[in-house]
Regions:
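Glycine-rich flexible loops
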Residues: 1-449, 461
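Short C-terminal tail/terminal secondary-structure segment
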Residues: 546, 703, 714-730
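Substrate-binding pocket helix/loop in short-chain dehydrogenase/reductase
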Residues: 552-563, 683
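Active-site loop immediately N-terminal to the catalytic Tyr-X3-Lys motif
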Residues: 554, 603-609, 690
Length: 730
């Protein structure tokens, strides 16, 4: 019988009658799903599905009909809402079996079985557009009203061990039946239906190499049965836990935090460059206790080579990770790089052999043969994906795989899915169709863009502009609070992504905030090291940070103004470039850098000698960097003029001084933005286009310079000044 709520040790009992009882039946299904997904030990991101057979009014006939509500394809239990569930006429789903039986090419893994997925949309209730899950037949064919299908680590541990069938009886005492591995689809659902018919007293079924499904006629009871199944497996595993001899015991010790970060800061860009032979990848570092216990163990090489078992896992992690035979007690980072390069070559050879051995006549073309998971003794795991969200999910799934192997090895012997079965999931026509339906990636989708000065003005606008194109944005600023505010704005707009993995800063989403003082090399070095740990490397750097300091007419008293102006506006850009150069050269991927100078660099005038000459020097710094960093990095400059809106270079007192200087009427009671607007309008009238210059105008030019659209442009200054003929470059 299910345990009392307070007795659960390995899952969280989260059901609250006071909440659930107030919900309508569909809301109750959503509630149950969210509570299951909220506990990471119950199911992984995007994995598993839930359903309820509910009565609803047919919009055509007005009659009450039975409707299957089931979590749709691509949804996540933790965050799903009503719109994430598909709804289908149950009687039409029942009738589909006769359609299937009429197919000549029916049977397990047949084209006819795959064709049934396309039939689901003909059963849609109320024109619900949500695509149905491949597991829809399973939920339909189980007669009980409520069905949960989950992928808990503890249960998959049993489903992935050598004695999975016998242990099903031992652990659950006949309350769960057992069916061997079958690829999800019509035939697997029919097998479960037949198994339940033959064993009417069971509460659920263990699905070999996959997970489990259970049911009830009450939603709360179904939830509690799910928890009971998982808790019972977890308790059995704990009773047989091998303690210090888990994974055969420890072979290596972990590096200390400082040494590990130093090693990764050099290794990750190199690895990213080697992996990105076709497209770039974003990394996630995992070095928690559980991961280190595995990678440091005696059995890690053997188990890693066996590969993963649950299909949810290896669709992200590939059939196996790349384990590097690194000795943290003896080897240095250069040795690690050599061993990684050798291991990568062997991995790609193995993957190509796997593809050629398992491919069928109609298989899709081989995908990138590079690993998505790298295991390093003493250091941890690095997972890779097309973006931060995907790499975090990949890390999460291999975390799950580690727990599955730990459990299976504790109670029996871990077994992976046979290579052909794994291939038939990885290269399944239905999975390929999903990939083909995915929208095209945005221009900067696989890029890491560091925007220095992102706390306000041009920098903030630039951070927003590149984020809109899919970039992973590092909002760096002298004022960390301002940087955090910009990063939060981006996260609020674009989300944190999915996946619940990553250690420290590498658990971040697509936008982070970091503090930096570009006049101090050690802070620049530390900031860029954090970027590497967060994302695996750096692609573009945009420096918008700058300083304008009012100076007196006595030149002899302006030494400090001169020193600070050149320190920020010139030396700062040089320090950033010289530190980024180390990463770019280790990475070996094309990149770009943009310095923000000024049209003042081209116009001689009175009253801003230090600022103007520093910006002129910055223009030539850009040209020198373009030569020095070629051909790997394109370096260009953005030259704004009179960007008043939102700029910390135009504080209220400077704006008032300028308004007074130009005899522009204003009131002391006006807001700073109102005063800035008046000054901007005045400046606009001095330009050829007669339009105020905004931070967004500058951001558009900065984006253009890093987008790849000007890939053959380097060493150039792009003026965004509305047309100041005095500043025309000659």
């Amino acid at each position: 019988m299910p345990y009392k709520p307070e007795d659960y040790k390995f899952v969280k009992y989260l059901w609250e009658d006071d909440v659930a009882d107030k919900l309508d039946p569909i809301e109750n299904l959503v509630y149950r799903s969210n509570k299951l997904g909220e506990d990471q030990r119950i199911t992984n991101t995007g994995g598993g599905n839930t359903s309820a057979k509910l009565m609803g009014k047919d919009p055509l006939t007005g009659e009450e009909v039975e409707v299957l509500w089931v979590k749709g394809s691509g949804g996540d239990l933790r965050t799903s809402k009503k719109e994430n569930f598909s709804s289908l006429y149950q009687d039409k789903l029942n009738a589909l079996d006769s359609t299937y039986q009429s197919f000549v090419d029916k049977g397990y893994k047949s084209a006819g079985e795959d064709r049934m997925v396309g039939m689901f949309k003909h059963c849609n209730f109320c024109l619900n557009p949500r695509a149905s899950s491949i597991d829809t037949p399973l939920h339909s064919m189980i007669s009980e009203k409520h069905v949960d299908h989950l992928h808990p680590n503890a249960v998959i541990s049993v489903a992935s061990c050598k004695d999975q069938k016998a242990l099903t009886e031992v652990i659950w005492g006949g309350k769960l039946a057992y069916v061997p591995w079958m690829r999800p689809g019509w035939e697997a659902a029919k097998l479960c239906e037949d198994t339940y018919a033959e064993n009417p007293d069971i509460w659920g079924i263990l699905l070999g190499q996959h997970g489990h499904t259970n049911w009830s006629n009450e939603s709360k009871s179904c939830y509690e049965t799910s928890l009971w199944v998982i808790e019972t497996a977890a308790r059995y595993i704990e009773e047989h836990d091998k303690g210090e001899m888990t994974f055969g015991g420890q072979k290596h010790s972990s590096l200390d935090g400082y040494s590990s970060k130093a090693l990764l800061t050099k290794f990750l860009p190199v690895a990213r460059g080697m992996l990105s032979n076709k497209v770039k990848f974003i990394g996630t570092v995992q070095n928690d206790e559980a991961t280190l216990r595995f990678v440091n163990s005696v059995d890690a090489p053997r188990l890693a080579e066996l590969g993963t078992s649950c299909p949810d896992h290896f669709l992200r992690t590939k059939i196996k990770p790349l384990y590097i035979d690194f000795n943290p007690e003896q080897d240095d980072v250069d040795t690690l790089i050599v061993k990684f390069e050798q291991g990568l070559e062997k991995y790609r050879e193995d993957y190509t052999a796997y593809y050629n051995a398992c491919k069928r006549d109609d298989s899709p073309a081989m995908r990138d043969p590079s690993p998505t998971v790298i295991l390093i003794p003493g250091v941890g795991m690095v997972a890779w994906g097309k973006n931060k969200s995907e790499s975090r999910v990949t890390a999460e799934f291999y975390n799950c795989a580690i727990e599955v192997m730990r459990g299976a090895e504790a109670i029996s012997e871990y077994t992976a899915l046979p290579a052909q079965e794994a291939f038939d999931i990885e290269y399944w026509a239905l999975e390929e169709a999903k990939l083909q339906r995915m929208p095209a990636e945005k221009t900067l989708a696989r890029d890491v863009v560091v925007v220095i000065g992102a706390g306000d003005g041009i920098g903030k606008a630039t951070a927003h502009r590149v984020a809109r194109e899919g970039a992973h944005v590092v909002c760096a600023d002298l004022n960390l609070d301002n940087a955090k505010a910009t990063a939060k704005e981006l996260t609020d707009i674009y989300g944190q992504g999915i996946g619940v993995a990553g250690s420290g800063i590498s658990a971040c989403g697509p936008a982070i905030a970091l503090a930096v003082d570009i006049t101090r090399r050690e802070t620049v070095e530390a900031m860029l090291a954090d970027v590497v740990i967060a994302y695996g490397g750096i692609d573009k750097v945009i420096v918008t940070a700058g300083v304008f300091i009012a100076e007196g007419s006595d030149l002899a008293k302006n030494d400090k103004v001169f020193e600070l102006s050149f320190g920020v506006n010139v030396k700062g850009g040089y320090i950033v470039a010289s530190e980024a150069q180390k990463i770019w050269e280790n990475q070996g991927l094309k990149g770009a850098m943009v310095l923000t100078t000024s049209v003042n660099a081209a116009v001689s005038k009175k009253g801003s000698l230090a600022y103007d000459t520093s910006k002129a020097a910055a223009n030539h710094l850009m040209r020198e960097l373009a030569v020095t960093l070629s051909p790997l990095i394109n370096v260009n400059a953005l030259a704004p003029a009179t960007v008043v809106q939102g700029s910390n270079m135009f504080p209220r007192d400077r704006v008032i001084s300028s308004l007074s200087k130009y005899d522009i009427a204003f009131a002391d009671s006006e807001s700073t933005e109102s005063l800035r607007n008046k000054l901007a309008q005045f400046y606009a009238q001095r330009t050829l286009t007669k339009q105020p210059i905004t931070p967004e105008d500058q951001a558009e030019a900065a984006y253009l310079l890093v987008s790849g659209q000007l890939s053959k442009t380097t060493g150039q200054v792009i003026s965004v000044d509305g047309g100041l003929h005095e500043a025309f470059l000659r």
